Amino acid sequence: MQNSQLFTESLPKHIAIIMDGNGRWAKSKGQPRVFGHKKGVSAVRKTIAAASKLNIQAITLFAFSSENWRRPEEEVGLLMELFITVLSSEVKKLHKNNLRLRIIGDTSRFSERLQKKIVEAQELTASNTGMVINVAANYGGKWDITQAVQKVAQQVALGDLSAEDITEDDIAKHLTMSDLPEVDLLIRTSGECRISNFMLWQMAYAEMYFTPVFWPDFGEESLIEAITWFVNRERRFGCTGEQIKALMSAQ
């Protein structure tokens, strides 16, 4: 096996990111929290572009947790409007680059206008064959497992499955990202070291990388640092950030 092939196979297939620190970043600049959220959109663009260059199979971004509804009403409203704006402005670019966009979570609580934008964005990119971008919105890991178990329970109630025969696979195939590899690498920004009810099942064996960088300051260099750490730690395959940059340039 060529070293380059071994190196490529050592990269994570599925990266999950908890995009944290927008509010604190904005506060450090003397700006309102929404300023940080808007700046965070730029970080999303940079991160998606870098991951796509590396042929990462899937990236899942934790945009809005089911607990975020507890935030001030004004901030939640601004986040929903920002979500609509970003979907409207970015989805055509994603489609042009053969990227597939999926919104993961209970979208029923969103406004009809936002739900319509979500459906349109997913339908436009559904046939694309490049990297899958999952945006977790109104998502919680406990919710994901619960809705999967409910579907299994329905099978039992219908007599299609006995309770004694339920396996992990029976539950896993009903999770929201059942068609993707489990998460190899979790990245959380802003220095917080917890997973905040994010992809509890899918991250069972993930390596977890915590960086003090606030999300608005995260970009290609930050992603390279995280992936370099992952490759050296998880695969025991010595590499440098320069090697990863070279791989990106070769794509």
UniProtKB/Swiss-Prot annotation:
The active site is at D20, N68 (proton acceptor). PROSITE patterns: UPP_SYNTHASE. The keyword Metal-binding applies. InterPro entries: UPP_synth-like, UPP_synth-like_CS, UPP_synth-like_sf. It catalyses: 8 isopentenyl diphosphate + (2E,6E)-farnesyl diphosphate = di-trans,octa-cis-undecaprenyl diphosphate + 8 diphosphate. One of its GO terms (molecular function) is magnesium ion binding. Its cofactor is Mg(2+). Mg(2+) binds at D20, E207. Binds 2 magnesium ions per subunit. It is an enzyme of class 2 (transferase). Substrate binds at residues 21-25, 33, 37, 65-67, 69, 71, 188, 194-196. Keywords: Cell shape, Cell wall biogenesis/degradation, Magnesium, Metal-binding, Peptidoglycan synthesis, Transferase. GO terms for biological process: cell wall organization; peptidoglycan biosynthetic process; polyprenol biosynthetic process; regulation of cell shape. Its EC number is 2.5.1.31. GO terms for cellular component: cytosol. Homodimer. NCBIfam families: PRK14830.1, uppS. Catalyzes the sequential condensation of isopentenyl diphosphate (IPP) with (2E,6E)-farnesyl diphosphate (E,E-FPP) to yield (2Z,6Z,10Z,14Z,18Z,22Z,26Z,30Z,34E,38E)-undecaprenyl diphosphate (di-trans,octa-cis-UPP). UPP is the precursor of glycosyl carrier lipid in the biosynthesis of bacterial cell wall polysaccharide components such as peptidoglycan and lipopolysaccharide. Belongs to the UPP synthase family. PANTHER family: DEHYDRODOLICHYL DIPHOSPHATE SYNTHASE 2 (PTHR10291:SF0), DEHYDRODOLICHYL DIPHOSPHATE SYNTHASE FAMILY MEMBER (PTHR10291). This is Ditrans,polycis-undecaprenyl-diphosphate synthase ((2E,6E)-farnesyl-diphosphate specific). The lineage of its organism: Bacteria, Pseudomonadati, Pseudomonadota, Gammaproteobacteria, Vibrionales. The gene is uppS.
